[in-house]
Amino acid sequence: MTFIHRLPLHIVSSILDQLDTITELGIAIRSHRIFYNSFKHNAQTICRNILSSQIPPNLFPYANALLESNVVDPSNHDSVKDLLRRLESRIKNDPKSLERFPVNAYAALSRALAAIEILRENLVSEALPLFMSSFEADHASGASQQEVFRLNRAFMRYQIMCNLFCVPYDVGSRLVDEDITRYFFHPFSPWVNEQILCVYRYLERKVAEAYDDVAAHDVDWGKVPVEWAYDANVCPMIQWNLGRGLPVLLSIIRAANFEERRQLLPMHPPRAYNMSNLPFQTLVHMLPENSLIKALNPNFSQRILDECTEANFQRLCQPLDGVQDDISSTPYLLWRAVHSKESVFWVAVDWELHKNHWDCACFVWDLEKPQRSAVVQERSNELSDIEPFFPRLQSSWEHDDKLRSENER
C-alpha cells in the first residue's frame, strides 16, 4: 500500500481544500481514487473551502447571490425578488461564509471568479491609461484595492443580471422591467450602477471585434444576413453572445486566431431570445421611468443636474454602495460631471454619448489629486465629442463595400 493510500480521508480533504479552483478539484478527483473518495464524503465542505479562498474580500454577499442565481428559476418572479432581497440583507450583514448549494453551482461560481480575475486585469490595462490621458489624471499604473473591489462587484453583478434576466423564450417570462429597476438596480446609486456599464462596454467591444472578424471573413457566414450599420448595443448576435456568461466571454476574448473565434461564435443562437431580454436593453433599466426626478426633486422637471442641490444628490446615495462610493468619492464626482447638463427628467443610459466614458471606465477610478468640477466637466464633454476610442472593423470600409457585403449574402 502506497503512502497516499494510508492517509485518513480528513487529511486528504485538507489537501483538496488548498486547490485554487473547482476546475483543479475536478482534475484531482479524476487523477486518484483516494481523492475521489474523499470528495464523495466531503463534497460540500471541500467546495466551500476552495471558494472561500477564491472569493475576493468583501464580496461574499455577491458570491452567494451568484450561486443562487445559477439554480433559481428566472420565470419564478417571487423567487427572483427574494434572491435580490437576500442580496441586500447579505451586503448589510456581510457574511463571510457560503451557503449550501449543489456542486454544479459551486463549479459555475468558481469558473466565473476565475474569469473575472483575468477580465479585470485586461480591462485595467486598457481602460486606465485612457482615463489618465482623457482626464489628465495622476494615477498609479495599476488599480488600487478600492478600484479592484468596484470592478469585481460590477463583473459579479453583470453575471447575476445575465443569469436572472437574459433568458430565452423557452425559460418563460423574466421579471418585468419595472421590477428589474426596483429590485436589481435601485438599491444602488446611479454611479455604482454605471460601473456595470463600464465592464459591459469592455465585454461588448471585445465580442464585437470577434464577431466582425468572423462575420466578415468566414465563408459559411456568407449565408447569414449581416447589417453592418447596426451598433453593437443593438446587434442581436453580439448581444446574444454577451449574455452567455463570463467564462464563455473570456474564451472569446482569449481566442488566439480566426479559427478559434469561428468555433466559439455560432451563426445562430441555439434558442430564441427577445432582444429586450439581452444585456444592453436590460442595463437601460438601471434608471427608473422619469429618471431621477423623484430623488432630486427639482423645482421643475426640465432642470439640469448641475442646478440641483447637494442635499438632494445625497438622496441618490444608497447604503449598499459602501463608503468607497459615497458622495465624496471620485465615481460620484465624475458621474455628476458626465451627466451635469442632462435634464433631471431624462438622465439616460446613452450608448452613443457615453461609450467613450465607459471605455475608459471613468466611474471606477479614484483621482489622486482633486480637480475642479468645471475642468472635469470640460474633459468629459470632450469625450462625448471625439471619435470612438475603439472603432469597429467596418468603420474603415467604404460605404459601397458595406452594401456589397450585405447584398451578396
What are these model-predicted stretches?
Residues 1-38, 44, 50-54:
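N-terminal Skp1-binding subsegment of the F-box domain
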Residues 2, 21-23, 45, 181, ...:
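Residue-identity detector for threonine
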Residues 5, 10, 32, 41, ...:
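Histidine (H) residue identity feature
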Residues 195-409:
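Charge-dense, extended regions
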Residues 41-258, 262:
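Charged/polar low-complexity intrinsically disordered regions
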